[in-house]
Amino acid sequence: MKAHEVNFDGLVGLTHHYAGLSFGNEASIQHRFQVSNPRLAAKQGLLKMKALADAGFPQAVIPPHERPFIPVLRQLGFSGQDEQVLEKVARQAPHWLSSVSSASPMWVANAATVCPSADALDGKVHLTVANLNNKFHRALEAPTTASLLRAIFRDAQFFAVHDALPQVALLGDEGAANHNRLGGDYGAPGIQLFVYGREEGVDTRPVRYPARQTREASEAVARLNQVNPHQVIFARQNPDVIDLGVFHNDVIAVSNRQVLFCHEQAFAKQGELMRQLRSRVAGFMPLEVPAREVSVQDAVATYLFNSQLLSRDDGSMVLVLPQECREHAGVWRYLNALLAADNPISDLRVFDLRESMANGGGPACLRLRVVLTEDELRAVNPAVMMNDTLFSTLNDWVDRYYRDRLTAADLADPQLLREGREALDTLTQLLNLGSVYPFQQEGAGNG
């Protein structure tokens, strides 16, 4: 059955700031306390969405979350009216304010893991929300992510959205950032590659930085998503590259159809994995980048592999890259050699995503890939699909509500909280989502 890969991109939130919250993510730590520009960040993301939609790649948007997230501050013992809660936490424990104000939900590659209907035992599209257990600021995301996904994929005839796994380290799950699908046409059954960094009872793990994904979590997600057991491979990421800042697999590898574009040091037992994929994926084409041409450190600094690999109708592929790749002589030289070589990649598209990149999120972090048949695509909430009208509407919305300068100190401003809630209230109407945010549900309950 004919199917399309639809990229659902996260819209950057109003509290986008640089707080260095993500240990193991080198860009996040490096840019701590830099002044951010939320308006520019949102517009950079929207420009990528629109450019890809205009190029014929189906594109949709996933809204930001409610931030600062007051309910969690109340759970941590801060009381009073919302404005009083903000004032108390800013004075007594400002690090909590930064955590509950993170705009990290923009990186929707971590929102969920997706199973297309062609791979599912029950023939539905499955999405299992990621618990993001390894980082406090990200572990807050799961309930709102589930609400948003259910408002977008609302037809139970076609879609099943599963809540996140229990919030324990044993079941740490980072979503689609540690998941790749390989095969032929999107609508045909494919092989799902789940990548993990640690496993209970196995000592081989990184030393410097945490391995966020467990094998136990990957196996549970595959079960929840009803992936046909004959179409699954579980592979361990090389712990040495995690220690070099490869905190998700999508920082060192990206797949599309029969192609796996990755660094030669991406996986533990990489030769064995490539043999397995060759035997199970017809026409499998690994594009393994040698360390002598691009080091792991340079791949992390430029986010070469945090790119999007997209298929055109003629079978050729486009590699969507951050501007940092073009600015690095060695990486750009490699990419031009790749373009000239015998493989499906026929075009490089470069985008300026500096606001997201400075927090450690490139093109691939910003998108959740969902393979949909024509019928399934028609069942998606149409208001989230990117087109000329939505692009214009969202740019106007950003201009109206977003600040062009934000520091950690600004997070205590009660006006920022009010601006954010008003903005999201408007957005839920624009995107026909209903009351998906806790502040909207509280308002309804108190009325």
From Swiss-Prot:
Metabolic or biological pathway: Amino-acid degradation; L-arginine degradation via AST pathway; L-glutamate and succinate from L-arginine: step 2/5
EC numbers, comma separated: 3.5.3.23
Pfam families: AstB
Active-site residues (renumbered): 174, 248, 365 (nucleophile)
Record-listed substrate binding positions: 19-28, 110, 137-138, 212, 250, 359
Alphabetical list of InterPro entries matching this protein: AstB_sf, SuccinylArg_d-Hdrlase_AstB
GO molecular function terms listed in the Swiss-Prot or TrEMBL record: N-succinylarginine dihydrolase activity
Top EC class for this record: hydrolase
Biological process terms in GO annotation: arginine catabolic process to glutamate; arginine catabolic process to succinate
Manganese listed as a keyword: no
Catalytically driven reaction(s): N(2)-succinyl-L-arginine + 2 H2O + 2 H(+) = N(2)-succinyl-L-ornithine + 2 NH4(+) + CO2
Protein keywords: Arginine metabolism, Hydrolase
Gene3D superfamilies tied to this protein: Succinylarginine dihydrolase
Record-stated family: Belongs to the succinylarginine dihydrolase family.
Described purpose of this protein according to its UniProt entry: Catalyzes the hydrolysis of N(2)-succinylarginine into N(2)-succinylornithine, ammonia and CO(2).
Subunit structure: Homodimer.
Protein name per UniProt: N-succinylarginine dihydrolase
Organism per entry: Citrobacter koseri (strain ATCC BAA-895 / CDC 4225-83 / SGSC4696)
